[in-house]
Design a protein with these regions (language model features):
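Nuclease and nuclease-like effector domains acting on nucleic acids or nucleotide cofactors
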Residues: 1-49, 53-98
């Protein structure tokens, strides 16, 4: 029974850690205006807010773990991170974020 409770806690914690908080993005944008428009609100053409360390890999959903990234570059990084996160879910010990 203790193992089941621990497993459920770990699964819940992993899922909760991946949740994105819009308030954290607003906090990031407040101190890091859009590179294209220099605005702290609204659209930022050609740019996205990116997590330096992926959430699935334990990265925090906090402004300190965020950066502006060009949209085209984000597609490449997202592809690599999805492969990494998929590997983590298999519990492999050989997962490397390229």
């Amino acid at each position: 029974m203790k193992h089941s409770v621990l497993l459920l806690f770990l699964l819940f914690a992993a899922t909760a850690a991946q949740a994105r908080d819009p308030a954290q993005v607003r906090a990031f944008r407040h101190t890091h205006p859009c590179p294209a428009t220099h605005s702290t609100t609204g659209a930022c053409p050609g740019w996205v807010v990116d997590h330096l360390a992926p959430l699935c890999g334990g990265g925090a959903d906090k402004p300190a773990n965020m950066q502006w990234q060009r949209t085209a570059e984000s597609y490449k990084k997202d592809t690599r991170e999805r492969a990494y996160c998929k590997c983590i879910k298999t519990k492999s010990t050989h997962c490397v974020l390229p």
